[in-house]
Swiss-Prot record:
High-level lineage: Bacteria, Pseudomonadati, Pseudomonadota, Gammaproteobacteria, Enterobacterales
Protein name (record): Exodeoxyribonuclease 7 large subunit
Subcellular localization(s) per the UniProt record: Cytoplasm
Catalytic activity: Exonucleolytic cleavage in either 5'- to 3'- or 3'- to 5'-direction to yield nucleoside 5'-phosphates
EC number: 3.1.11.6
Amino acid sequence: MLSSQTSSIFTVSRLNQTVRLLLEQEMGQVWISGEISNFTQPASGHWYFTLKDDTAQVRCAMFRNSNRRVTFRPQHGQQVLVRANITLYEPRGDYQIIAESMQPAGEGLLQQKYEQLKAKLQAEGLFDQQHKQPLPSPAHCVGVITSKTGAALHDILHVLKRRDPSLPVIIYPTAVQGDDAPGQIVRAIELANARGECDVLIVGRGGGSLEDLWSFNDERVARAIFASRIPVVSAVGHETDVTIADFVADLRAPTPSAAAEIVSRNQQELLRQIQSAQQRLGMAMDYYLANRSRRFTQIFHRLQQQHPQLRLARQQTALERLRQRMGFALEARIKQANQRQQRVSQRLSQQNPQPRIHRAQSRIQQLEYRLTENIRSRLSEQRERFGNAVTHLEAVSPLATLARGYTVSTTTDGKVLKKIKQVKAGDIMTTRLEDGWLESEVKSVTPGT
């Protein structure tokens, strides 16, 4: 009985190792809520404590590289939410958890919900850049969805009045905090789309805690922003506050004031641009008029200079000058032609081509003779080599052997018969003669002596 169970006997070390691997592989990383007790921090900087509830407790460790990211000092009796890996300390067989992050219980649960919703909507593609709508440029009417009594609305209106006083603004007042806030925000977005009064929406509120901003982490609000046909600019809290609405919106502004800056034109800048354009237009007009005036003056002087009498006098003077130039040029050309003729005659007498022609003809005859002799020599050499090759080939050719009375026999599969053991009585063989082939059947086989 004992021998049949030896394969399942564990040593203590192997047992603890097996249990540790099972815990780490099967459980993985989990979220645990509980109350802190027995909190200690030795010189190493690691934290050691116990997490407990009304009926159970578990040992916990949080190493220094993880606990330095915690933004508060854990206290005895404090309720916390811990993200941890479950393991077993093999030397003592103690089951424990290794904490990776820690948050106060209330805020931690909200953060967990935030991360879960963010992952869900991201997987559905609600954050994808391809769904983002461009903002109108310029905007002709701005819709604001926020609390009518909040500081955010005051900031938005103040910036719009300063930058673009003529820009129409429609306010869709809603609660931005509390249980009813998400539903009101959704209805305001749907109302703005149904009425179609504005071409861009600012959705937001002032700063606050995670709980204060939670309405903008609501799934209903996120889907309403995504479904809006009007481009939405999110403006929730301060620059460090990031909500689900910011990821879904077509554009995120760090603050409500920044959102107002984004959707509006700067009237002072527009005025400066108009003044600059007027100045450039005035300069261009002055340049154009001055240029046309110069052109008119040039044409007037040209018309005066082209009066028929003036033109006739100038043409007569020019004609006389041409006659003189033609006379001088003709005399110079005749003189140059005579000089050139003399030089050519001298050069021809000095460079008679007849001797050069004779030398070239002699050279050609020599080359022709050498070429002919070379061709004859090479041709004779090639004929001799060809004759030798033919003689050699005829000497080693199987056909020459056949002509002397020999034959070559092969089996049906083409193998040359060299020995009688390659055939037996009844086999068919083919015999090659000088002038053809014979096919014959082996009647008998007699070994040679």
